[in-house]
Amino acid sequence: MEINFRHEINGQKVITAIAQDWKTGQILMVANMNKDALQKTIETGKAHYWSTSRNSQWLKGESSGHTQEVKEILVDCDMDAVVLKVKQNGAACHEGYFSCFFRKLNTKNIENFNEEDLETILEKVFNPDDVY
């Protein structure tokens, strides 16, 4: 049995990785992992991902210090996505929020919505200008 790295982005075979707070169940972020990133995550207990924009592996929190300690890894029925149950140290979102899902979409028309249709539902944990 094998993990199914069937999604290809920029020539890299990846799986979808969802980071979830291990205590509350809050979804923190969605990213991609290639085989090496998943292996490194398993070996170190720290979340590693594959950056599709930089085409490189990265350790979550490498520059910000906001790391993810992996407590458990769940695999979906198709073996092409994982949920990382993590202890989030600091914030998961590079924009300064605990979760990347800090906005609520309040519209019935996804083809024509604007900034007023997005409601910020979380407070910032840090100022990105101070970290990046």
From Swiss-Prot:
It catalyses: 1-(5-phospho-beta-D-ribosyl)-5'-AMP + H2O = 1-(5-phospho-beta-D-ribosyl)-5-[(5-phospho-beta-D-ribosylamino)methylideneamino]imidazole-4-carboxamide. Keywords: Amino-acid biosynthesis, Cytoplasm, Histidine biosynthesis, Hydrolase, Magnesium, Metal-binding, Zinc. Zn(2+) binds at C77, C93, C100. Mg(2+) binds at D76, D78, D80. GO terms for biological process: L-histidine biosynthetic process. Gene3D superfamilies: Phosphoribosyl-AMP cyclohydrolase. Transmembrane segments: none annotated. One of its GO terms (molecular function) is magnesium ion binding. It is found in: Cytoplasm. GO terms for cellular component: cytoplasm. The keyword Magnesium applies. Its EC number is 3.5.4.19. Its main location: cytoplasm. PANTHER family: HISTIDINE BIOSYNTHESIS BIFUNCTIONAL PROTEIN (PTHR42945), HISTIDINE BIOSYNTHESIS BIFUNCTIONAL PROTEIN HIS7 (PTHR42945:SF1). Catalyzes the hydrolysis of the adenine ring of phosphoribosyl-AMP. NCBIfam families: PRK00051.1. Homodimer. Belongs to the PRA-CH family. This is Phosphoribosyl-AMP cyclohydrolase.
